[in-house]
Amino acid sequence: GGFYWMTNRAGSIKIDAKILYGHSFAIYSLSEYTLATGDIRGIEYAEKIFDLIQKYCADTHFGGYFEMFERNWKLKGHGAAGGDRKTLDVHMHLMEAFTTLYECSGKEVHRRKLVEIIALIIDKILHPEFRTGIPQFFADWKIAPQIKFDIIWGWDRFSEDGSKGQAEDNTSYGHNVEFAWLLMYALDLLNLPLKKYINIIQKQYDHALAHGIDWEYGGVFVEGSHAGGV
């Protein structure tokens, strides 16, 4: 079950791995398809993917989700293979996917998993002082130096040899603002009070405005230190 990571335009499989990042967008897009068209096949497939994720990806010991798997859902190896890492990027987009899934299905299990992942991101993934996103963790949620995975979708964040400057102190300005927006959307859908989270959201926006904007040439820097700077 699930989706291959990559095919060519003719449909031939190029990379047969099962990557949680891709499955989060499958849930999101299929749920949105049903919301837009009324065609129930979208939500039916989205729920099947959700069930696969809970079966194969959920870490029932430390919480959160593993992210990188072989075709048969065997967890990939350590290091660049990504099997021992958990990331803000994937968990943020799972939150986004669970939001739209719950919006479409209205099922309690989808609401519960959405509430759980919001709490996990805030408690484990955001910096305790600056409330900015920490990119990578080991399975037990100890902060991990940011490395380049074998399968990746953000090539601009690393040098050609895969190294990362300030690998233990960097945060993505774009991800922080994106998370804040997605969180507000999820809270509205869940009918939960924004007041409880407004300080976190405000810190993330203020941090991005103060340190992430290139006021000289325009645009947004990719990332910088949690304390500020590029």
Set out the residue ranges of the language-model regions.
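Glycan-recognition and catalytic cores of secretory/periplasmic carbohydrate-active enzymes
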Residues: 1-230
